[in-house]
Amino acid sequence: LLFQFGAIADIHNQAKEKYSPGWKNYFEMAKWLDRNVNGEAVVACGKPSLFHLYANKYTLRYKFANPEEVLKHLEERQVDYVVIDQVYGNTLRYLLPAVQQYPERFQQVQHLTNPDTYLLKFKR
Protein backbone atom coordinates (compact mmCIF):
# COMPACT_ATOMS: atom_id res chain seq x y z
CA LEU A 1 0.00 0.00 0.00
CA LEU A 2 2.85 2.41 0.75
CA PHE A 3 4.27 1.87 -2.74
CA GLN A 4 1.05 3.11 -4.30
CA PHE A 5 1.40 6.52 -2.63
CA GLY A 6 4.83 6.96 -4.20
CA ALA A 7 3.40 6.19 -7.63
CA ILE A 8 0.57 8.67 -7.08
CA ALA A 9 3.06 11.35 -6.08
CA ASP A 10 5.09 10.65 -9.24
CA ILE A 11 2.01 10.99 -11.43
CA HIS A 12 1.05 14.21 -9.65
CA ASN A 13 4.52 15.67 -10.25
CA GLN A 14 4.51 14.62 -13.91
CA ALA A 15 1.17 16.35 -14.42
CA LYS A 16 2.77 19.65 -13.42
CA GLU A 17 5.50 19.42 -16.06
CA LYS A 18 5.29 21.33 -19.33
CA TYR A 19 4.48 19.51 -22.56
CA SER A 20 7.28 18.78 -25.00
CA PRO A 21 7.25 21.10 -28.06
CA GLY A 22 5.69 18.38 -30.21
CA TRP A 23 2.81 17.81 -27.81
CA LYS A 24 2.39 21.55 -27.28
CA ASN A 25 1.95 22.05 -31.04
CA TYR A 26 -0.39 19.07 -31.26
CA PHE A 27 -2.73 20.58 -28.68
CA GLU A 28 -2.33 24.12 -30.08
CA MET A 29 -3.38 22.82 -33.50
CA ALA A 30 -6.46 21.25 -31.95
CA LYS A 31 -7.34 24.55 -30.25
CA TRP A 32 -6.82 26.42 -33.52
CA LEU A 33 -9.17 24.01 -35.28
CA ASP A 34 -11.80 24.49 -32.59
CA ARG A 35 -11.62 28.30 -32.94
CA ASN A 36 -11.45 28.47 -36.73
CA VAL A 37 -13.46 25.60 -38.20
CA ASN A 38 -17.17 26.03 -37.60
CA GLY A 39 -19.59 23.16 -37.56
CA GLU A 40 -18.88 19.50 -37.78
CA ALA A 41 -15.61 18.22 -39.17
CA VAL A 42 -13.93 14.84 -39.22
CA VAL A 43 -10.23 14.87 -38.34
CA ALA A 44 -7.77 12.00 -38.85
CA CYS A 45 -4.75 12.12 -36.55
CA GLY A 46 -2.38 9.99 -34.52
CA LYS A 47 -3.93 10.36 -31.08
CA PRO A 48 -7.61 11.05 -31.79
CA SER A 49 -8.94 10.93 -28.23
CA LEU A 50 -6.37 13.47 -27.04
CA PHE A 51 -6.86 15.74 -30.08
CA HIS A 52 -10.63 15.67 -29.52
CA LEU A 53 -10.22 17.07 -26.00
CA TYR A 54 -9.10 20.41 -27.45
CA ALA A 55 -10.60 20.38 -30.96
CA ASN A 56 -14.18 19.46 -30.03
CA LYS A 57 -14.50 17.73 -33.40
CA TYR A 58 -15.04 14.12 -34.41
CA THR A 59 -11.61 12.49 -34.59
CA LEU A 60 -10.36 9.13 -35.78
CA ARG A 61 -7.07 7.39 -36.40
CA TYR A 62 -5.90 7.02 -39.98
CA LYS A 63 -5.28 3.50 -41.24
CA PHE A 64 -1.85 1.93 -40.72
CA ALA A 65 -1.34 0.87 -44.33
CA ASN A 66 0.17 1.80 -47.67
CA PRO A 67 -0.69 5.24 -49.15
CA GLU A 68 -3.48 3.88 -51.38
CA GLU A 69 -5.22 2.21 -48.44
CA VAL A 70 -4.75 5.28 -46.22
CA LEU A 71 -6.39 7.47 -48.88
CA LYS A 72 -9.24 4.99 -49.37
CA HIS A 73 -9.84 4.94 -45.61
CA LEU A 74 -9.92 8.76 -45.45
CA GLU A 75 -12.49 8.80 -48.25
CA GLU A 76 -14.64 6.06 -46.69
CA ARG A 77 -14.67 7.81 -43.33
CA GLN A 78 -15.42 11.18 -44.98
CA VAL A 79 -12.42 12.86 -43.39
CA ASP A 80 -12.20 16.64 -43.76
CA TYR A 81 -8.78 17.30 -42.17
CA VAL A 82 -5.59 15.44 -41.30
CA VAL A 83 -2.90 16.38 -38.80
CA ILE A 84 0.79 15.85 -39.54
CA ASP A 85 2.48 15.89 -36.15
CA GLN A 86 5.89 15.21 -34.62
CA VAL A 87 4.68 13.22 -31.61
CA TYR A 88 3.48 9.97 -33.10
CA GLY A 89 5.87 7.91 -35.21
CA ASN A 90 3.08 6.28 -37.18
CA THR A 91 2.13 9.67 -38.62
CA LEU A 92 5.47 9.82 -40.41
CA ARG A 93 5.29 6.13 -41.30
CA TYR A 94 1.74 5.98 -42.71
CA LEU A 95 -0.02 9.34 -43.09
CA LEU A 96 2.86 11.44 -44.42
CA PRO A 97 3.65 9.04 -47.31
CA ALA A 98 0.00 9.26 -48.41
CA VAL A 99 0.21 13.06 -48.38
CA GLN A 100 3.48 12.97 -50.31
CA GLN A 101 2.17 10.49 -52.89
CA TYR A 102 -1.10 12.39 -53.43
CA PRO A 103 -0.27 16.08 -52.80
CA GLU A 104 -3.16 17.22 -54.99
CA ARG A 105 -5.58 15.73 -52.43
CA PHE A 106 -4.34 17.88 -49.54
CA GLN A 107 -4.26 21.62 -48.92
CA GLN A 108 -2.33 23.25 -46.10
CA VAL A 109 -4.64 25.13 -43.75
CA GLN A 110 -2.38 25.83 -40.77
CA HIS A 111 1.29 25.34 -39.93
CA LEU A 112 3.04 25.58 -36.57
CA THR A 113 6.83 25.49 -36.29
CA ASN A 114 9.37 24.07 -33.85
CA PRO A 115 8.51 21.31 -34.56
CA ASP A 116 6.58 21.45 -37.81
CA THR A 117 2.95 20.51 -37.28
CA TYR A 118 0.42 20.78 -40.11
CA LEU A 119 -3.33 20.84 -40.48
CA LEU A 120 -4.27 19.80 -44.01
CA LYS A 121 -7.67 19.90 -45.69
CA PHE A 122 -8.42 16.57 -47.35
CA LYS A 123 -10.00 17.01 -50.78
CA ARG A 124 -12.50 14.17 -51.20
Please place each PLM-identified region on the residue numbering.
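Short periplasmic/luminal acceptor-recognition loop of GT-C membrane glycosyltransferases, typified by
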Residues: 34-63, 81-86
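Alpha-helical elements of the RecA-like P-loop NTPase motor core of helicases
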Residues: 3-6, 52-53, 93
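Transmembrane alpha-helical segments
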Residues: 1-23, 31
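Flexible, glycine- and charge-enriched loops at secondary-structure boundaries
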Residues: 19, 23, 60, 67
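Residues at the C-termini of beta-strands that transition into short coil/loop
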Residues: 2, 47, 63-65, 112, ...
